[in-house]
Structures are given as C-alpha cells and as structure tokens.
Amino acid sequence: MTIEPDDDIVLQVSDLEVTFEGRAVLSDLSFSVARGEILTILGPNGAGKTVLLRSLLGIVPYHGSITWEPGLRIGYVPQRLPYIRNMPLSVADFFGFKSGSTGDVPVMLDTVGLPPELAGNLIGDLSSGQFQRVLIAWALAGDPHLLLFDEPTAGVDVRGTETVYALLSRLYQERNLTMLVVTHDLAVVHRLSSMVLCLNRKPVCHGPPLSVLTPENLQRLYGTEVRFYEHGHE
C-alpha cells in the first residue's frame, strides 16, 4: 500500500505481528492514523504498547505492513533514558547528539516552558518533570509532523504530570501535530485524545474515546473493573 501526500491518512498498519523467541507479543493489529489525530494507545503492562512504537520506528522486526506518508518527519519521546541521566552531560551537550539540533538550545527550552539558562545545567540535576520536557524539546528539534510518546509522564509526580499533558495540548494546537501517545493514565484520555487504541497483545477496541471506552471494553482490557479519576487540566 502507498499513501499519497495529499491523503488524510499519515500511517496505515495492516495485520501487524511481532514475535519474540516464538511467542506472539503483538498480533492481528490493523489501524490507521489521520493527519491531526491524537491517538492514545492504552493497555496494561506487558500489552505490547512499547513494542508497537518500536515496530513503527523500525527498531524491532515484524510481520505485516507499516506504511508512513512519504516525507513525514517523526519525533520520538522514549519512556526513560536512565543511562543519559547518569552521564556528565549538560542539557546543551545532550541536544548536540541530535543531528540538526545544534541551533539555539535556549529557544528550544523556552518552547517547552523551561528557562533558557537550564541549557548549562547537568542532565542528572534536572527533576523528572524537567527532564521529560527536555526530551520533548529534543524531539521537536527536527520540526516533526508527528510525535510518538512512550509513557510521557512515567516517573513524574502529579504536578509534573499536569504540566506535561498541558504542554502536549498546547504543542498540538500551536504546531498542528499528529500524536501517538502510550499512557496508563485513563483520566487524561478523554481530555487529550481524539482516538484511542486499546491493546493487550491484540486489539481490544479502537475508536473515539466516548464511544469505545465502555466498562465492558475496559474490563476486557484490564481484566477487572476500572473507573475514571479525572485530573484537572487547564
């Protein structure tokens, strides 16, 4: 399958299957992503959500087809980079690792609500919330059309979580981005997402959150009763 540049679809996944050592980690997975969509990928630990993102990036082998719109620029915000935090690197040094991102680091930091002087700080001295915003700024440095987020608030406290999700909402509006967001945070799904993919090694549901996040589907997804506890996002 090919995707034309003027199509509304920027990503088409068909019959995706990933196996590790003969065990199916993902199977029977087909979905598409439209331009401007925010797709939340929801599921329990071990559901294959991170494997899906890595498959989309071509990092892990897979069967089936993954088709991106030609020329689409993609940014990726991983769940954790602990080894980076243990290295004696400044924020500016970290940006220097990325080809094409050696420009004005303070401006990039300002984009994600961080003070420009933070460029000289060591990565290891940042709070979890600050580091997560640095990763987002790093992903934005290549001026992407689409961003992939793997648990963008993992290890971040409640206040930092609110800040990160408010930032994602603002960036989406200001930059006309398409986003794929892996999260465990049910409370933000209705506020942030236009579509949700419920995944537990196989697709459980896919569609608008208000339509598909029923008690029955959530029980199928998690194997227990799940209730929403809403955060307040500005």
Give the residues covered by each predicted segment:
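Conserved catalytic motifs of ABC-family nucleotide-binding domains
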Residues: 143
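Catalytic Walker B motif of ABC-type/P-loop ATPase nucleotide-binding domains
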Residues: 147-151
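The feature captures the beta-strand-to-loop junction immediately N-terminal to the Walker
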Residues: 42-44
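Conserved ABC ATPase "signature" region
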Residues: 103-118
